[in-house]
């Protein structure tokens, strides 16, 4: 047993040889004979061309989906897959004409995937279907409050591009100093990033590795079957509440509360990758919130909050869901930060006292059994060596964020005068805290809550500025600052996980992220501008397919925040209560882990419980199905095979669902309509339906 210092990071390694099982299940053994490409061999003209073409094409699809449905399938896996095939086509073309070329490596494939995803996700985080369109007069014309004057700002392509360049790079520099802590020390899962990495590794596995070929075959079997499943489901979703995805697994009463299995293979795959404690915690949180708390609060309609409000109105039941869940996430995140600061201070104090060895502190992350593990496998040592080799100075990241914040404090009020300099400064002070909490949650549960943090910022800044000062536009613009920073941070950390598992240089990842973000800040506004001019976006009177549904919702939240305090009755009290409970739960897990209590396995994860307050219960149910399938596979089928093939199977489930959803979305974009409707009704409703049909036939 020995310690190696790499890039200032202490990594514990085992000098003994790995046992036969660990060697057999090693991914990096298959690539051991391949030299690692340099930065110049990763960032090539080929990767730049493929990234540019794919980024633009995928952005068109993402923008169209954003402006019509507000939904977006996972783009990471399709980007990696399409990048692989386009690069192969490029190579074949060069071979035909006899031009020499560099080998296409998994590191270059990862770079393409990072650039394409960072470009296309700006279609959503850029707010084209939400806060930017919500500022327009088309969205305001339907309302009677704040529909003119300083509370309306028509979209302008030049202003939008400038705003995106100011706010979209800040999230990258927030998260860079935390990459070692989250990826190396605490081993956060980042399920989507892990799935993408296994997919890319499978594409580039050397032919001599028998085990790798088995993983590739398994992955493509899982992928192929899963791709067809969403397309098959589409044929039976020919109406509202139709299709297999609304199967009332536990009965109609549970279905109405959201407790059912929706046959989403993405959730099943995530459940197979995530630790069982996370899945159990999310199930517990769903039962407490969706099974007990929200039904009770709904009985208070008319007293605690107005009746007949829209389901997404933060002045109603949605307000309790958002604020109570956010209070728990903030409590756990702040506890984690404070614990890390205390442990760091203690370690520094011991060093100053001349201690020869500083015992590694137990990290404060509760969700993942995050105690620093001994890096015993060849894969762990190899990946850590590459990941820590090209390190970024922390002061450079901090200075870059400070410079971007200072530039935004000056420039954003010129673009949106409703936001003052102090408002922008306050947003940039709060953004790192939100970004850390969100990246932590994404690493554990794969749930990105950046839009939720943006809504919180929208309400705060709208109330701060007020109606007369243009609080509606101010809140929407502040939402953009927070969403861009928070979403960019979590997306980049997902990419760090992908790069860690594919031995991609962190510097190459930063280049790909910056290049893709810069491209997205230009391409997406141009695409949006075409849609905005050609179609009737943001207002009524269109052809029905061109109305952005979330633009009015976001503007309604801002108007609600300006016109009244915005918070439903007793929500602040509930937030305080659950904030205290979350702190107590985090402290209990910390004490139990420090003292190695057996009760630790029964104390739920705070972040898992909190996320369940937002997401529908069908997601934890799907994850539980995946966790149960993995348990049966390990205990009753083949433990060795489960250890070897689990990443491939889970990746195929997640990736295939993303590709299949993209294909079914394309059918929707082509205005194709499913021919069949499968609907589940109760026995009494079926009797009424039969009676009605009998009268029609008579």
UniProtKB/Swiss-Prot annotation:
One of its GO terms (cellular component) is membrane. It is a multi-pass membrane protein. Its main location: membrane. Signal peptide: none annotated. The chain crosses the membrane at residues 43-63, 67-87, 114-134, 157-177, 216-236, 277-297, 322-342, 395-415, 424-444, 463-483, 511-531, 567-587, 607-627, 644-664. Keywords: Membrane, Transmembrane, Transmembrane helix, Transport. GO terms for molecular function: oligopeptide transmembrane transporter activity. The keyword Transmembrane helix applies. Expressed at low levels in roots. The keyword Lipoprotein does not apply. InterPro entries: OPT, YSL-like. It comes from the Eukaryota. Residues 1-36 are annotated as: Disordered. It is found in: Membrane. May be involved in the transport of nicotianamine-chelated metals. PANTHER family: METAL-NICOTIANAMINE TRANSPORTER YSL17-RELATED, OLIGOPEPTIDE TRANSPORTER YGL114W-RELATED. Belongs to the YSL (TC 2.A.67.2) family. This is Probable metal-nicotianamine transporter YSL17.
């Amino acid at each position: 047993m020995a310690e190696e210092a790499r890039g200032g990071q202490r990594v514990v390694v085992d000098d003994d040889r790995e046992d036969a099982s660990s060697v057999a299940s090693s991914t990096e053994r298959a690539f051991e004979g391949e030299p690692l490409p340099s930065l110049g061999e990763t960032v090539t003209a080929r990767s730049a061309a493929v990234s540019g073409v794919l980024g633009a094409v995928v952005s068109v699809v993402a923008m169209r989906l954003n402006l019509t449905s507000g939904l977006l399938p996972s783009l990471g896996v399709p980007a990696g897959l399409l990048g692989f095939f386009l690069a192969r086509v490029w190579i074949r073309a060069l071979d035909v004409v006899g031009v020499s070329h560099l080998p296409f490596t998994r590191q270059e494939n990862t770079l393409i995937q990072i650039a394409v995803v960072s470009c296309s996700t700006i279609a959503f985080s850029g707010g084209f279907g939400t806060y930017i369109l919500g500022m327009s007069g088309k969205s305001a014309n339907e309302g009677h409050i704040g529909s003119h004057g300083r509370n309306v700002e028509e979209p302008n392509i030049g202003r939008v591009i400038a705003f995106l360049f100011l706010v979209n790079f800040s999230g990258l520099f927030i998260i860079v100093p935390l990459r070692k802590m989250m990826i190396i020390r605490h081993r956060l899962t980042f399920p989507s990033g892990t799935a993408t990495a296994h997919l890319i590794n499978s594409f580039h596995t050397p032919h001599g590795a028998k085990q790798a070929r088995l993983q590739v075959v398994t992955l493509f079997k899982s992928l192929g079957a899963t791709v067809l499943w969403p397309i098959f489901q589409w044929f039976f979703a020919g109406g509202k509440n139709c299709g297999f995805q609304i199967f009332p697994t536990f009965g109609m009463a549970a279905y109405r509360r959201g407790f059912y299995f929706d046959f989403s293979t993405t959730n099943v795959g995530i459940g197979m990758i995530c630790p069982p404690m996370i899945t159990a915690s999310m199930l517990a949180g769903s039962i407490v919130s969706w099974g007990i708390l929200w039904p009770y609060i709904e009985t208070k309609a008319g007293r605690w909050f107005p009746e007949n409000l829209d389901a997404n109105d933060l002045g109603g039941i949605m307000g309790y869901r958002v604020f109570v869940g956010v209070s728990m996430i903030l409590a756990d995140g702040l506890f984690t930060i404070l614990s890390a600061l205390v442990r760091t201070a203690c370690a520094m104090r011991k060093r100053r006292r001349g201690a020869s060895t500083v015992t590694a502190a137990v990290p404060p992350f509760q969700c993942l059994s995050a105690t620093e593990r001994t890096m015993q496998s060849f894969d762990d040592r190899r990946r850590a060596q590459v990941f820590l080799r090209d390190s970024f100075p922390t002061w450079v990241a901090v200075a870059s964020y400070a410079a971007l914040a200072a530039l935004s404090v000056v420039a954003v009020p010129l673009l949106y005068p409703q936001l003052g300099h102090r408002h922008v400064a306050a947003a940039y002070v709060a953004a790192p805290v939100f970004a850390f909490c969100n990246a932590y949650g994404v690493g554990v549960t794969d749930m990105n809550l950046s839009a939720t943090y943006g809504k919180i910022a929208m309400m705060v800044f709208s109330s701060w500025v007020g109606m007369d000062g243009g609080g509606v536009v101010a809140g929407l613009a502040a939402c953009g600052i927070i969403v861009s920073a928070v979403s960019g941070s979590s997306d980049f950390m997902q990419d760090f996980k992908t790069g860690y598992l594919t031995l991609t240089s962190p510097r190459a990842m930063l280049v790909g992220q910056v290049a893709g973000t810069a491209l997205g800040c230009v391409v997406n506004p141009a695409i949006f501008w075409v849609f905005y001019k050609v179609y009737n976006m943001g207002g009524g009177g269109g052809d029905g397919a061109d109305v952005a549904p979330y633009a009015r919702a976001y503007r309604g939240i801002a108007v609600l925040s300006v016109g009244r305090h915005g918070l439903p009755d007793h929500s602040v009290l509930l937030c305080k209560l659950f904030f205290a409970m979350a702190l107590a739960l985090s402290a209990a897990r910390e004490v139990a882990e420090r003292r190695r209590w057996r009760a630790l396995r029964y104390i739920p994860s705070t972040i898992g419980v909190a996320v369940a307050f937002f997401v529908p219960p069908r997601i934890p149910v799907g994850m539980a199905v995946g966790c149960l399938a993995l348990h049966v596979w390990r205990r009753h089928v083949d433990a060795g095979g489960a250890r070897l093939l689990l990443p491939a199977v889970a990746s195929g489930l997640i990736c295939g669902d993303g590709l299949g959803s993209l294909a079914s979305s394309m059918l929707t974009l082509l205005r194709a309509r499913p021919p069949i409707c499968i609907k589940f009704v109760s026995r009494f409703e079926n009797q009424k339906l039969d009676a009605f049909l009998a009268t029609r036939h008579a």
